[in-house]
Amino acid sequence: MTVVAIVGRPNVGKSTLFNRISKDNSALVDDLPGVTRDRNYARVSWNDKPFVIIDTAGFVGQDTSAFEELTREQILLALDEADILLFVADAKTGLHPGDAELADLLRRSSKPVFYAVNKIDGSEQRRHAAEFFELGLDRIYPISAAHGFGISELMDDLCAAIPEAPAQTAEEEESGGAIRVSILGRPNVGKSTLVNHLLGAPRVIVSPVPGTTRDAVDSHIVKAGQEYVLIDTAGIRRKGRTREKLEKISIIKALQSVERSHVVVLLLDAVEGVTDQDLHIAGYIKERSRACIVGINKWDAADKDPKRTKRFMDDLHDRFRFLTYAPVLTFSALTGRNVARLLPTVKEVFRQYNQRVTTGIVNRALEETLARHEPPQAGNRRRLKFYYATQTAVRPPTFVLFCNYPQAIHFSYERYLTNRFREAFGLDKTPIRLIFRPRQRTGGTS
């Protein structure tokens, strides 16, 4: 699929254009220069031409900042990946030396380049784009990413440069079997380092400074014939410690990434131990009924002390009692030690998360479960009776059990039923739901 990269100086409106083209708000947009620090990807279609669009961080030519050096490297990687380049400049600030440097860089790429001058809000303002012809350009597209002016003309011409290929819808791509994996955790726990190790390339900026990753960034990878979409998310802090508006937005986007995911890898720090914030994140994953793997990073810095590792594991098992189905893996994202176990575990967890059980097998398991431990009394009324059960959904596996007094089922007996169903159907690594309903009667009132 053709890849289009949006490039330009900071705060010229690249993310706004990205959102306009992709018709969503998947990239952070804020008035602060340098908001988008990693590349962000979206699969879109325009004029029935499917393509991938990349939103890159702002290009800064001369800057000694370590972050800017990392960002420049990311932009160069994006240029390597792209088939078509979309240059964006800012009409309000005018022609800038950084525009000239970037335009020279793009010309050397030998790839098709479309030059857009943003923040032109109508035909009467087209004259503000004229000075950019000093860059030696043959064609300039005056646009307003915020208001939509000129976007259709730009995108029609850009899509005409995309080679004809069999159209593939988003639904078809999704049905191709890709497992969507969010990597979630507190700031600086090693999420980006883990993603980069899995990819084998510096796809995400890595820095010891907490908060380096602000956006949730998608990366595609194929291992052993299985496609994965890795979502590296911004670190989540407690709300009280999140002071910048931008960081608050990133937290929301990280939690939204959970909604998009099949499996969530909750990354903990072996050195810092289990924190209240880890517990908070785990609770959110549980609440959303997502499949989960608990990954303990930096284990090589902790496993030299057996007493310390035992305390860590004891604390983990005690505080994560509600997440007992989640496999626990220990590794070092930095060195790669034991990281190879992660994706096979993701694949197995996802298999269970999607597992279906026939109604006959479900009811045989229910009969055996009831025979082993009869239902308790339903308060002062008759004994609780179960009539039949069926699976109604996957992601997670969901079972509806029909009985006479669904509201009277004690949580301890529900836990017993849940554990027996896990054992009977091989669902030890996925959340499952049990829903209790009164038996439906036909031919009269219930």
UniProtKB/Swiss-Prot annotation:
Which of this chain's residues are annotated to bind GTP 1? 8-15, 55-59, 118-121
**Sorted UniProt keywords:** GTP-binding, Nucleotide-binding, Repeat, Ribosome biogenesis
Is Nucleotide-binding tagged as a keyword?
yes
Q: Tell me, what is an example of a GO biological process annotation in this record?
A: ribosome biogenesis
Q: Which InterPro entries match?
A: G_ENGA, GTP-bd, GTPase_Der, KH_dom-like, KH_dom-like_a/b, P-loop_NTPase, Small_GTP-bd
Q: Which SUPFAM superfamilies match?
A: P-loop containing nucleoside triphosphate hydrolases (SSF52540)
Domain KH-like, first and last residues per copy: 355-440
- One Pfam entry name: KH_dom-like
Identify the residues that bind GTP 2: 185-192, 232-236, 297-300
Q: What CDD domains does the entry give?
A: EngA1, EngA2
Domain named EngA-type G: residues: 2-166, 179-354
MF terms from GO for this chain are: GTP binding; ribosome binding
NCBIfam families assigned to the protein according to its UniProt record, in alphabetical order: GTPase_EngA, small_GTP
Family, as annotated: Belongs to the TRAFAC class TrmE-Era-EngA-EngB-Septin-like GTPase superfamily. EngA (Der) GTPase family.
HAMAP family for the chain = GTPase_Der
Its function, per the record, reads: GTPase that plays an essential role in the late steps of ribosome biogenesis.
How would you summarize the oligomeric state and partners of this protein?
A: Associates with the 50S ribosomal subunit.
What this protein is called in its record is GTPase Der
Q: What is the protein's species of origin?
A: Syntrophobacter fumaroxidans (strain DSM 10017 / MPOB)
